[in-house]
A protein has these predicted regions:
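Active-site and adjacent substrate-binding regions of carbohydrate-active enzymes
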Residues: 1-219
Length: 219
């Protein structure tokens, strides 16, 4: 069973997560989730859960605090830059529309939308937090994760212009997945790298499987 993002979220699509340690009340409770996993396992059915790590809701407590206080420890959990910082491209458009949104005299980065700001994947504390999130759901019996937007942990215009984005993405996923598999070797990972097959190929060095969008489009 592949479950889409079941976490609390203020929107219909659920990509803007406000709490990574709970279940959206529209779907039930954590006890309901545990029962689902237990009943699935009794029937030799594995459960794969969507894991949206690249970004969080702009209503997530960490982002709210980082927005209200530039000196907060959570400020470095997201990508913030001063408006006169020329090491960033504030006009970058990795998807559709500008990725940088202005708040007072600062900008924050959200590749998909200003309502889902990107996390700072270069921050070791963020990496540890995300490893802990995965561990939490593994402890509840989850057998694998579908990684959303895997290539956007390091995206166009998000970090210093000199970075090799592919290398940084692979390094990030190697660290996080190793952290997970240290306690569950048979954890299965499938990722969404929405790109051509040639661009997806390098991710097999870090991930168990990837969606083949070229094949899907050709069928």
């Amino acid at each position: 069973i592949w479950l889409l993002h079941v976490y609390p979220s203020p929107s219909y699509h659920g990509y803007d997560i406000t709490d990574y340690y709970d279940v959206n009340s529209d779907y039930g409770s954590l006890e309901d989730f545990k029962n689902l996993v237990d009943e699935a396992h009794k029937r030799d059915i594995k459960v794969i859960l969507d894991m949206v790590l690249n970004h969080a809701s702009s209503e997530h407590p960490w982002f709210v605090e980082s927005k209200e206080d530039s000196n907060s420890s959570y400020s470095d959990y997201f990508i913030w830059a001063n408006e006169n910082d020329n090491t960033y491209d504030f006009n970058s458009t990795p998807i559709d529309g500008k990725a940088w949104s202005k708040f007072n005299d600062r900008y924050y980065y959200g590749a998909f939308w200003h309502g889902i700001p990107d996390r700072n994947a270069s921050n070791p504390k963020v990496r540890n937090e995300l490893i802990n999130v995965g561990q939490y759901w593994m402890d509840l019996g989850v057998d694998g994760f579908r990684l959303d937007a895997a290539k956007y942990m390091y995206a166009e215009g998000e970090y210093n212009l000199e970075l090799n984005l592919l290398e940084e993405n692979l390094d990030f996923w190697n660290e996080v997945i190793t952290g997970w598999k240290d306690s569950k070797e048979d954890l299965h990972i499938v990722s969404e790298v929405w790109s051509s097959s040639s661009s997806v190929a390098p991710y097999f060095s870090s991930l168990d499987s990837n969606f083949n969008f070229d094949l899907a489009d050709s069928i």
